[in-house]
């Protein structure tokens, strides 16, 4: 919430920040969507709400929220000796934007995580095969 408060000040916005939990935020987002009313939420990716709703990030030319982030796979150096296929897989593995969100939405909608993962793998079998060969 601190960065959001800083952004409101930095951009001179006449908004009121309403701190809440993630579930309260998505509930309010659902209500606003159902009523076709605009809303601004503090969102992050990956998150299932991006697969369910048509959301976009607002521009932040002042970089209040910082630069774009990324995720790296980090492994114990000994793993290369103990499990080379695992290391080879991790070097090839990549999610495209939105793919994690769609799997998260499936689990949010009650699907078991393994079933959601299996469905994603089935839909992207060529790519998954390239990771394990």
Where in the sequence are the language-model features?
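Solvent-exposed loop/turn segments at secondary-structure junctions
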Residues: 1, 24-25, 45-50, 79-81
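Short, solvent-exposed mixed-charge patches
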Residues: 132-133
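Ligand-binding clefts/hinges and TM-proximal coupling segments of bilobed small-molecule sensing domains
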Residues: 2-3, 78, 84-128
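Active-site/pore-lining binding-face segments in mid-to-C-terminal subdomains
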Residues: 47-67, 71
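A bilobed periplasmic-binding-protein/Venus flytrap-type ligand-binding module shared by bacterial periplasmic
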Residues: 69-82
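A ligand-binding cleft/hinge motif common to bilobed small-molecule-binding domains
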Residues: 31-56
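Bilobed "Venus flytrap"/periplasmic-binding protein-like clamshell domains
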Residues: 1-11, 15-28, 114
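Acidic/histidine-rich, surface-exposed loop or edge segments in extracytoplasmic proteins
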Residues: 9-11, 73, 98-102
